[in-house]
Amino acid sequence: MFDALQAWLSSFLFDWLAVLITLVLQAVAVILPVMITVAWLTYAERKVIGYMQVRMGPNRVGPGGWLQPIADAIKAMTKEVVIPAQSNKYLFIIAPILALAPAVAAWAVIPFDANGVVAADINAGVLYVLAVASIGVYGIVISGWASNSKYAFLGALRASAQKISYEIAMGFALVTVLMVADTMNLTGIVEGQQGGIWNWYWIPLLPMFFVYFISGLAETNRAPFDVAEGESEIVAGFHVEYSGMAFAVFFLAEYAMMILISFMTAIMFLGGWYSPFEGIAGLESVFSWVPGFVWLFAKVAFLLFLFLWFRATFPRYRYDQIMRLGWKVLIPVTIVWVFVVGVMEYFKVSPWFN
């Protein structure tokens, strides 16, 4: 899609200018929808948790509270960013940007449809997402150190140890997907699940599906893995000294990563943009008019609801329990399942291994 735009611009502009304009439009096309979705995901979270606690949630700004995210954004932008006197001022400001940039950059390879709606359809898409998403921990560590606060530093140490621990399990879960799909291209992984719900990878990789999603909860510091910002223990964790828009940027990064994990889970395990009724007589023709991106967004919405549901349901783990779950449960399970998938690959278990 963007290649055609670049070719058209090159017909009456300098080549370098056409490339520059195309790259800027690609960045805007990726960043703007993500930021808009993040804004209203915060509203959805407050509404969902409110209903689970038998209350209304935000309902004052706009009809049904729909304009609450705009009010929150205005409030964050008009607040002062207070920089602690003894902090490292430059790193203190840079840290939120370092946390947000990887969460946004990872979206460059996420496909949204079978028609090539993707900013960069590279062959090593899975490796790119895993590598870029892991960089976000640097922003968290730097924020804790630069704040010159013991609470912030403790939260940063917790977050870094937690992310490193669960990235191993997440990486092994991705290895099993690559063994089944035989490609690291995200579009190719989705196309390998064509043929109906029984061809999706969640069936042969069911333990990996749960491991990946649980690791995603831990990676994003979401409940019940939110010890890095445990209010009852270390006030607010690594961003305890932040205020205003600098504080909001950390939340943008967290929610952008939530959406990214949901998209990756839907793409790798739940058939991406393919209909769950594909191959089912009667139902396939009834739902054939629904575009592929609608199915993808529906799956992502369900996974995001699980993020919100878990926050409202489960109590926070202790730090030692989180480490034990990552190192003594999830990693051994993933290693065992790598061997199981290898056996299924050897015997060509149909329909996933052909």
Swiss-Prot record:
* Keyword Cytoplasm annotated: no
Q: Which Pfam families match?
A: NADHdh (PF00146)
Any idea which UniProt keywords this protein has? Cell inner membrane, Cell membrane, Membrane, NAD, Quinone, Translocase, Transmembrane, Transmembrane helix, Ubiquinone
Residues passing through the membrane, by range: 16-36, 90-110, 126-146, 170-190, 197-217, 249-269, 290-310, 329-349
The UniProt entry lists membrane topology as: Multi-pass membrane protein
An example of a GO molecular function for this protein is: oxidoreductase activity, acting on NAD(P)H, quinone or similar compound as acceptor
Write down the superkingdom of origin. Answer: Bacteria
- Record's subcellular location: Cell inner membrane
Q: What is its EC number?
A: 7.1.1.-
- InterPro entries attached to this UniProt entry: NADH_UbQ_OxRdtase_su1/FPO (IPR001694), NADH_UbQ_OxRdtase_su1_CS (IPR018086)
Q: Which GO terms describe its biological process?
A: aerobic respiration
UniProt KW Transmembrane keyword: yes
Q: Which GO terms describe its cellular component?
A: plasma membrane
| Reaction(s) catalysed by this chain's protein | a quinone + NADH + 5 H(+)(in) = a quinol + NAD(+) + 4 H(+)(out)
* Assembly mode: NDH-1 is composed of 14 different subunits. Subunits NuoA, H, J, K, L, M, N constitute the membrane sector of the complex.
* Function recorded in the entry: NDH-1 shuttles electrons from NADH, via FMN and iron-sulfur (Fe-S) centers, to quinones in the respiratory chain. The immediate electron acceptor for the enzyme in this species is believed to be ubiquinone. Couples the redox reaction to proton translocation (for every two electrons transferred, four hydrogen ions are translocated across the cytoplasmic membrane), and thus conserves the redox energy in a proton gradient. This subunit may bind ubiquinone.
Of which family is this protein a member?
Belongs to the complex I subunit 1 family.
Name under which the protein is recorded: NADH-quinone oxidoreductase subunit H
Lineage per the UniProt record: Bacteria, Pseudomonadati, Pseudomonadota, Gammaproteobacteria, Thiotrichales
In the UniProt record, what gene is named as encoding this protein?
nuoH
